[in-house]
């Protein structure tokens, strides 16, 4: 056989006898097999042949094999023929060295040397001898058979002529987990997410907390040298959290070009600097009204604005127009400048400026700032004067909420509204302005909530700021520590600060005025809001609410510093500081607290069985406090100081009601003193009603009480009996009297009023349209609507027709004749009434309460109030009417009403409600005007 035909193969030759017959059986399937797949053949000596492309083999071994060496042939070699091998069957399976039973599953007997695997010499990580195969090859793993573990090729791969590959990986083999094990791992994953979300500042607290073990580790998988305690949260997730914190912010979403809240607020604040400029008066009027504001309004009730800063910014034109409009609106009532004054009443002069300022403020409730808050407080005071109870109540509530939103109830050193995280330290003047604005909200809450069923919103313990400093310290910017409302000192002075050591000396009129109003708020809460009924102790007991309030009122006046105690010298000192009105107002409030507490004991004599000694002492304190208030008002008038605070007018009203009681006293000296003090108080109330509209109602109430007391004196009543019948009028009750200002709606004839469904009643129950028979006969029958135009058309001709038809019989079927007779009677009664009282009504400007009433129903013709806007010109006669009480006034003969009853003291005066005769006691040439 020619070997040139098999250049690509090297066979192990055994010298077969018939080579030609086997030439056609050469296995060509391994013709292109790489020699590297059979590494065991590389050590053998191959036959040198020039035709081998893979390299030249040594000739020695080749020749040796060709010569028929006795060495056993390699049956794995390509040169061997399995079909001619006697130890193989027709399927190529080896059958050499088989013994009985092997084909039935037995194991061949091998030597001990051959049974030792190749990997037995390897050691484990612990240094022990390895007993198990560390890693099986990929083909054996796929076929799921036992791998011998030899490298680079195992025994199975060599027999099967397939590549033997071992997968080398660094991942540890972990046991398979079932579904329950996966559920156990979820809490651990959730815990890791929570830890990643913890801020950096909270890591110190979380670092000491060990993480819980969700599932115990498999025994043997955790080395014994590893500690069992888990790592802390900071150690495990600290780098990740720090990297997350330092990561740049996410880019803005495309299309989201809307402005942020901060940008909107800054835009509104910039707009506030120019909005309302077109409504401002001239520069001269602005400066004039600013001086009027600081002379008549500042310090009386509210200590708002810093005068040097305000005037400097006003001249420079850097003030927001809304603030200038607000100041001009509230100050216009006190000026006599002809450019500001109008034909209407004084308390309505600044309404045009106030309307512009009110519109600007109410649109900015979303963006609170100190400017809007100050405007709300001043506008609330202005609406108080214009009898707009609803507006004043709403503006006060909005101001209180805004003050808490700005954190004015806290004494902060830095501005809480710092932009971009910057902290701006507040100066002393800025901190004092913030304190005074908050205290103004506190005072407004006490004033507005003093009426019945109006609880107070601000608790005293929520305000953690000191009281205002003296006025001169505030004007000149001199820091000084003061006490809080409860007497604590938040910042006690040190010897090295250079401040005044006595904290009470740093407190001026404003601080003690706030304490007086706070005490008055507690007293009114106890008397008018049900706290008095909850007191189980009698009034004269030392633990009762009454005695606690009485002691607080007396001790507050006694605790004043020497510079604030009332004296002529201290009044002159305050004149030099331009604060005499504030000084007088503070002492009026202190006396009013004593009057209020003591008068409550007088009213409760019969109800609680008060002892005579206790009642006598309470009566003495009440009359002394009332006299003291009148003396302060008289001294203010003599010294040229006008106390313009509205609450001072209410104190004068309370004092007046006590003087009216003293008129029927059997003590001549008390009676004379009461008459003189009553004159002083009524003159002061007449002056106040020009600037604050609600005092028209109080003046009429005083007139009613005076008439009722004179009627009671004729009936033989004494002071004690009259005091128990007296119901006390609260300061905040004017809200119910004037909820929406002065309008004709509150004087409308109820018989002609047609019920309409309003939008405010949309959620309430539907009212029946029909009336029962009982209501049909008891309620007055309303007039027909079609008669209204006829009555209005005939009104201008009434007087002329009355003159023509005097003495003529009335023709039947003419409704005008009945109206003429009614009008004639009303006019005659009007002249009798005005002549008897001596009211100076002249010309067209005179007030005509009966002619101005509704002519549709004469039964309601006497209910018109002199404060109707249709008759505002009637207010002018009060300035020219002399106000005095002559001695003959006590001898006037006032009749009772038709039923013989005496009206209560707190009712409004109703014209025509008393029978009077001008010839008996009212026609002696004396003039009486309240």
UniProtKB/Swiss-Prot annotation:
InterPro entries: TF_fung, Transcription_factor_dom_fun, Zn2-C6_fun-type_DNA-bd_sf, Zn2Cys6_DnaBD. The keyword Signal does not apply. One of its GO terms (biological process) is DNA-templated transcription. Residues 137-164 bind DNA. It is found in: Nucleus. Its main location: nucleus. SMART domains: Fungal_trans, GAL4. GO terms for molecular function: DNA binding; DNA-binding transcription factor activity, RNA polymerase II-specific; zinc ion binding. Zn(2)-C6 fungal-type transcription factor that has a role in the establishment of the fungus within the plant and/or the progress of the disease. Regulates the expression of virulence factors such as SIX1 and SIX6. Multiple copies of the gene are present in highly virulent fusarium oxysporum strains. This is Zn(2)-C6 fungal-type transcription factor FTF1c. It comes from Fusarium oxysporum f. sp. lycopersici (strain 4287 / CBS 123668 / FGSC 9935 / NRRL 34936).
